[in-house]
Amino acid sequence: NGKIALLKGRSNYLCLHRLRQHGGSSTLLDRTTMVELSDVRRWATSTKSGDMGEMKSLAEDAKVLPFVTSTMDNCLGKDCPDYEDCYMIKARRKALDADLVVVNHHLFFADMALKDTGFGELIPEADVVIFDEAHQIPDIASEYFGESLSSRQLHDLSRDLELVYRTSLKDAKQLHTAGEKCKMTSADLRLLFPEQAQKGNWREMLTRDEVQTQISKLNDALNILYEVIKLHLSRDKDLDSIFERVSDARAKLARLTDAGQKGVSLW
C-alpha cells in the first residue's frame, strides 16, 4: 500500500512564467506556434498537474514547447515569481512523500549532475535504486558528466534574450544586435560540420584553419554579448539568468578549444 510517484524532467511541465512571458510577444512566433500557444493557454486554466503529456492534441515535437516549458539553463529557480505555483516543484513535493519514485535514466543522471540551479536536487534521496535497461547507462551518464556547447544552446539563448528585449527592455536594442550576432556566428560554425550529428576527434577538428577562424569569431561574439548584457544587469531577472548562461558558454568554449588539456577526452 506504499505511495508511488512518477517524476519527469522539467521540460515536461508547463512553466507559468514562460507562458506569461509570451502573452504579448506574438511577433516572435509564427502562425502555427501561435495556434498551439492558444491551445496551451486554454488547457492551462484547468490542468492540475501541468504535465504537458495531458495535451494529447499537442505533438511531442510541437514548436510551442520551448516557449512554455523551462530548461535547466533558463529556469529562474527560487527567483521565479511563480515558484510557489510551479508544477515541477509540486511534482517534487509529491515525490518526497512517496515510498517509490519512478524516473527515467536521463532525469536520474541530470539530477546527479545538478549544481547550484536554485532548485537543488529534484529526486528525493533513495535507499535503493533499480535500473531498467542498464546497458544504456554509460552513454547517458557521459552526456551529463561531460561538458558540451552546441549551436542549439546558443540559439535558445539568443531567443530568450530577444524575448527580454521585446517585452521588458525595449530601450536596449544592443541586446537584440549582440544576440543575433552570436546566433549567426554559431550557425556559421555549425555549417563547417556534417549535417547529421556524428562522433569524432575534436582535437583533429581544431587543426582546421576554417574551424579555428570561426571559433575565434564566436568567442568575440560571446565577449561582446557578455559586455552588452553586463550594462543592464539587475534590470530584469531573466536577463540576469541569461548573463550567467553567457558566462558559462564563454568558459566552456575556452575549455573545449584547449587541445592541450590532459586527462580529458574531446569529441
Model regions and ranges:
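A substrate-engagement module of RecA-like helicase motors
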Residues: 1-101, 106-109, 161-162, 194-197, ...
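Helicase motor interdomain insertion/brace
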Residues: 10, 212-267
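Short, charged low-complexity intrinsically disordered segments located at boundaries
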Residues: 18-27, 184-193, 213-220, 251-256
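Generic alpha-helical secondary structure signal
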Residues: 31-38, 50-66, 89, 152, ...
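Generic hydrophobic, helix-prone segments enriched in Leu/Val/Ile
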Residues: 39-46, 182, 202, 253-254
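P-loop NTPase motor domains
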Residues: 48-57, 127, 255-263
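Signature of the SF2 helicase/ATPase Hel1-core->accessory helical subdomain module
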Residues: 72-217
